[in-house]
Amino acid sequence: MTGVNPATGKNPAPGNGPAAEGGPDQTPSPAKDTGPDEDTASDEDTASAQGLDARLVVDRGDFHLDVTLSVAPGDVVALLGPNGAGKTTALRSLAGLTPLSRGGRLRLDGVALDRTPPESRPVGVVFQDYLLFPHLTALDNVAFGPRCQGVPKAEARAQAADWLDRMGLADHAGAKPRRLSGGQAQRVALARALAIRPRLLLLDEPLAALDARTRLDVRAGLRRHLAEFEAVAVLVTHDPLDAMVLADRLVVVEHGRVVQEGSPSDIARHPRTDYIAQLVGLNLYRGTAEGHTVRLDTGPAITTTEELSGPVFVAFPPGAVTLYRDRPTGSSARNLWRCEVAGLETHGDQIRVDLTGELPLAADLTTVAAAELGLHTGAPVWATVKATQTHAYPA
């Protein structure tokens, strides 16, 4: 069960389970016994089907979502993608706030939840803005879920106190949300979601509302709590660092479909779309390999150290690019292209140079190097990359 949207301002009352946080404005209502779906798994199937097995199909106007997820208990999966890719729609369909369309399915620990209302699902949700009840203390916010499950008030408050203690918030149990910092509010929201002992934990951009310093501390704590969580966790984010640090596996969604999935290291090492390449900071190209030479689909050839054949991707980091104002002589780099500066911007402690020309690419230079080269928009340059700094892999 999840927590309800506090926008109604109504006092919580015991019941069978709350609606999902961020869902329709409603007070908890008793869960209906909808019975199993016709295709509910047998006991034997259920015993061997622990975790999440879902195909999330949602048709909404011109947008079509079709995402398949399979997650084992104890694993954390991050849904990563640009704005409008369908990440939040997928999360809401898992919570039951957005109904699945024809062809969709949702099983949790072998039990079909397709037709189960949100308040009856064993799901905890933490949304981006947390949605804590403003009129309740931190303690009562966390106790709300257990109370709606029928736990006696004293026991529910004791459980809530234990969760707040685990979150390092024991001293803030009596504080109302307006007295909490962003990081404290995030931890209260997480405690509220975990207090109902969910079999599926959903987190929608859980760190997005925090400043950089607070995010650093809260991210470390969230990683610890997720490592201790024994059920399934699904995290939605557009921040690659959050995804890399918090998740065991990444599922990248673009235009409503999965374009790549794998471990964080595999995704970072082998991006397969421009979005992912930009996310992990790589120049990415597609072409056809003939030995150590890759002839790009659009552009020149690139020399690599890998010996491959057929369709491939080639990637290299912006830091692997060396720029010259004049054509270099005596360089050991096997790749040389004539380019033009399209733009410059500060990128951390370096200057990111966007280049057009024979090969569009990004290059990272120190501020001193950029000044010595006298770079400006429209300046002609030569770009070189050593073959040893490229990475080619099958498409």
Regions found by a protein language model. Give the residues of each.
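Pre-Walker A (P-loop) beta-loop-beta motif of ABC nucleotide-binding domains
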Residues: 67-78
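ABC nucleotide-binding domain signature
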Residues: 78, 114-117, 122-131, 143, ...
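The feature captures the beta-strand-to-loop junction immediately N-terminal to the Walker
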Residues: 80-82
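ABC ATPase nucleotide-binding domain helices that frame the ATP-binding cleft
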Residues: 88-91, 188
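Helix-to-loop junction immediately C-terminal to a conserved catalytic motif
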Residues: 95
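ABC ATPase nucleotide-binding domains
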Residues: 122, 137-272
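Glycine/charge-rich catalytic "coupling/switch" loops of P-loop NTPases
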Residues: 298-345, 367-395
